[in-house]
């Protein structure tokens, strides 16, 4: 494991621009525990990361316009997860890091969110990294990294990734 060196993103040394600035400008997160601003509405949470109108972004992930205007604490866990997903996908960041993004969603909604994540990569050109234990989600990946106890076990390209039996 490297302990020294430099990290470059789009040709720029991340340390020179600052880690905080790099994260703010280049990386959007979908946290497993949502990390929403709890005194705001879903629409206000999305507006934190995007100049796009928030309601259409929230509708894309399955919320109604009425739900988009409620306080986030009045939403179910699955609805809060959708807000976190909308917030990340609406951002201008070229990288999306998603920790179990479909963990609290029903099967149909999880499939819809997976399509949105894939479209973000294939249509919008974002780098989408998903951490998951779901075999079904892993099968949708272009590349699968299998980790065990923090160590890289295997790296599988698109076709082999679709044949994944189980994810540990």
Give names to the regions the model predicted:
Residues 4-13:
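Conserved ABC transporter NBD signature motif
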Residues 14-28:
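ABC ATPase NBD coupling module
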Residues 53-67:
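Conserved ABC ATPase "signature" region
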Residues 71-75, 79-81:
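Conserved ABC ATPase signature
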Residues 85:
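Hydrophobic anchor residue at the start of the ABC signature
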Residues 92:
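Conserved catalytic motifs of ABC-family nucleotide-binding domains
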Residues 96-99:
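Catalytic Walker B motif of ABC-type/P-loop ATPase nucleotide-binding domains
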